[in-house]
Design a protein with these regions (language model features):
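Transmembrane helix segments
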Residues: 104-143
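Alpha-helical transmembrane segments and their short interhelical loops
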Residues: 40-113, 163-171, 176-181
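Short cytosolic juxtamembrane segments of multi-pass membrane proteins
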Residues: 186-194
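Hydrophobic/aromatic residues in alpha-helical transmembrane segments
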Residues: 13-17, 61, 95-96, 119, ...
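Long, hydrophobic alpha-helical segments
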Residues: 1-19
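Transmembrane helix boundary and interhelical loop/hinge segments in multi-pass membrane proteins
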Residues: 13-38
Length: 194
């Protein structure tokens, strides 16, 4: 259940950012926005909030399905803590999607996003338990945000509150992805300046 929640949230934030922004760039929408009074920070934060909002229905639907069809039982506090932590955990993935959207061409953004989605899902332990993977893949997976998001959920549902490694991994990816997104946006605005 936790892996599917992470996988669904990851796709939601990627599909709301990368390919969509690349398409908006291709049709000239981002250039149109720059001639309006809308500040760039507001435009970027709007994209980010939209991506995070898109993740919520996917997460909640998987949780409801887990309860309805598999009789998963957690306390209300565990459900809220798990969903909130995992929702916050997809922030670096949404930022990474922003970077892809502002860097990749329209025809490349979707395949690139899909490849990244599958790689993060497989290597991050969302397709199969990380413990059955070769050690090299486990080591790679532990450094990925997809594994860290799932680790938050697994720890919370297992009654373990301590998740410092997952939080550190997500913090590092958030910093790196935010930097990449800002640099990509600046590059885009410089290249498409009138």
């Amino acid at each position: 259940m936790v892996a599917m929640i992470a996988y669904g949230a990851m796709w939601a934030v990627f599909s709301a950012t990368g390919p969509r922004i690349a398409h908006e760039r291709a049709i000239g929408w981002t250039r149109q926005l720059r001639v309006t009074p809308l500040r760039p920070a507001s435009a970027l934060s709007g994209k980010l909030v939209t991506a995070l909002a898109a993740a919520l229905p996917a997460m909640v639907l998987v949780a409801v399905t887990a309860v309805a069809s598999h009789h998963v039982q957690l306390s209300a506090a565990q459900w809220l803590a798990m969903l909130a932590a995992m929702w916050a955990g997809v922030l670096p993935l949404a930022l990474l999607g922003l970077a892809i959207g502002y860097l990749a061409a329209d025809e490349i953004a979707f395949p690139l996003t899909m490849a990244l989605y599958f790689a993060l899902g497989a290597l991050g332990g969302l397709w199969m338990p990380p413990s059955v993977m070769p050690h090299a893949m486990q080591d790679i997976g532990q450094a990925l945000p997809s594994d860290a998001v799932a680790e938050l959920g697994w720890r919370i549902t297992g009654g373990q509150a301590s998740v410092p490694k997952a939080v550190l991994v997500l913090a590092a990816w958030t910093l790196g992805s935010a930097t990449a997104a800002l640099l990509a946006y600046r590059r885009h605005t410089i290249r498409s300046a009138p």
